[in-house]
Amino acid sequence: MLLLWALPLLLGAVAGLEVCYERLGCFGNRIPWSGGTLERPFSTLPSTPKIVNTRFLLYTNENPNNFQEISADASTIRGSNFRTDRKTRFIIHGFTDKGEENWLSNLCENLFQVETVNCICVDWKGGSRTTYPQATQNIRIVGAEVAYLVGTLQSSLGYSPSNIHVIGHSLGAHAAGEVGRRTNGTIGRITGLDPAEPYFQGTPEIVRLDPSDAQFVDVIHTDAAPMVPNLGFGMSQTVGHLDFFPNGGKEMPGCQKNVLSQIVDINGVWEGTRDFVACNHLRSYKYYADSIVNPNGFAGFSCASYTAFSANKCFPCSNGCPQMGHYADRFSRKTDGVGQTFYLNTGDSSNFARWRYQVAVTLSGRRVTGHVLVSLYGSKGNSKQYEIFTGLLKPGDTHLNEFDSDVDVGDVQKVKFVWYNNVINPTLPKVGASQITVEQNDGRVFKFCSTDTVREDILLTLTPC
């Protein structure tokens, strides 16, 4: 894949100025679309619609496993399981990918678990499996084809564009932007999954995804390190109303595995090889798929930077936490501005959802050197132990920390405290927690108290004060 991204820097060539197609209109290769700028040094026209061969693969709750191919011919839509009383979600893949790749249909399957929906996977492998600069031009054809289908839905079936959500990964995110531009921002929502950076970062809004392309635009950035020298394929530039940078947006947990373990992936050699080449870049659609079935597991925190977030300076959410992914549109202030930036942490495997808690522990008992851990027990489940503090344990001192649990414990009902010496202590001191306060990201606070102290490695249970 890296070769395909880099090769165009040597192979760009000057083409004609404009080409027109009856259904889709005209496409030129002048600035800002192509040639003459630092971001787009080569002049290239899109491939023909026949070569790009945009296809629409419809999955619904009635046919979740086998697609029905539809087109902008209204008769194919009426003869399918498409229903006008449902939302429609388009999914557009990126460079070198295809619409029949498992991740697109898997995303549809997750959607069917939580809603009744028309899920349309857009295949444009005829235009994506070429040199990278050519593919960046071919997304204009893809966007035009999707927009034409949206127009058919509106004119022939009375279907409102506001009921349409376009989800695009990599180059597909900018194809989604082209859909929005051609439909004058009437699309209900566009989600950009790590929008591609080369040939798009720093370009005018007309070329790339931007907030004016839909009534609401949300973006997940997972590979935002610079293309040179870090080989980051995704944009660092904010291009939505809400821009989420999980784990800081550059290096995703689980993407640092050794080469062999990553290629021989649990999902097979093909998926493992894809992960090895572009693990961070692919995480965006995996996070989105996981967010569908974890409605509150991807809370984003408004913060000046990921460094500030990691330093526990952004908790709780004073104006509420938007959820990264599928439920981002439930955030009441989603369109209060553009480029609203949010940070969060995720897991490193298939269960990416995390629930962040802030815990304050007030110590009692002896003065010793050691470290303190707590675990939460709640109405939905129990967390593992998380370290709150290490150092001098002094009675009366309060230590505060935040952690990301892989379990949503629900309403916290009790807390278990344990401590350990940092050095061997023959005096067998006892330490306790007179009070532990647990705060959730929505601002709810739970307080627990105890008058007991315990020796190291002995659990102390605190109950509500």
Curated annotation (Swiss-Prot):
Catalytic residues as annotated in Swiss-Prot or TrEMBL: S170, D194, H281
An example molecular function term from Gene Ontology annotations: triacylglycerol lipase activity
Enzyme Commission code: 3.1.1.3
UniProt cross-references to Pfam families, sorted A to Z: Lipase (PF00151), PLAT (PF01477)
Residues given in the record as Ca(2+) binding sites: E205, R208, D210, D213
Signal sequence, renumbered to the chain: 1-16
Catalytic reactions of this protein: a triacylglycerol + H2O = a diacylglycerol + a fatty acid + H(+); 1,2,3-tributanoylglycerol + H2O = dibutanoylglycerol + butanoate + H(+); 1,2,3-tri-(9Z-octadecenoyl)-glycerol + H2O = di-(9Z)-octadecenoylglycerol + (9Z)-octadecenoate + H(+); all-trans-retinyl hexadecanoate + H2O = all-trans-retinol + hexadecanoate + H(+)
Family to which the UniProt record says this protein belongs: Belongs to the AB hydrolase superfamily. Lipase family.
Compartment annotation: Secreted
SUPFAM superfamilies: alpha/beta-Hydrolases, Lipase/lipooxygenase domain (PLAT/LH2 domain)
Entry protein name: Pancreatic triacylglycerol lipase
Subunit structure: Forms a 1:1 stoichiometric complex with (pro)colipase/CLPS.
First-listed, main subcellular location of the protein, grouped into a coarse class: secreted
Ranges of residues in domain PLAT: 355-465
UniProt function note: Plays an important role in fat metabolism. It preferentially splits the esters of long-chain fatty acids at positions 1 and 3, producing mainly 2-monoacylglycerol and free fatty acids, and shows considerably higher activity against insoluble emulsified substrates than against soluble ones.
GO CC terms, sorted: extracellular space
Activity-regulation annotation: Inhibited by bile salts, is reactivated by (pro)colipase/CLPS.
UniProt keyword annotations, A-Z: Calcium, Disulfide bond, Hydrolase, Lipid degradation, Lipid metabolism, Metal-binding, Secreted, Signal
GO biological process: lipid catabolic process
Disulphide bridges, residue numbers: C20-C26, C108-C119, C255-C279, C303-C314, C317-C321, C449-C465
Record carries keyword Protease: no
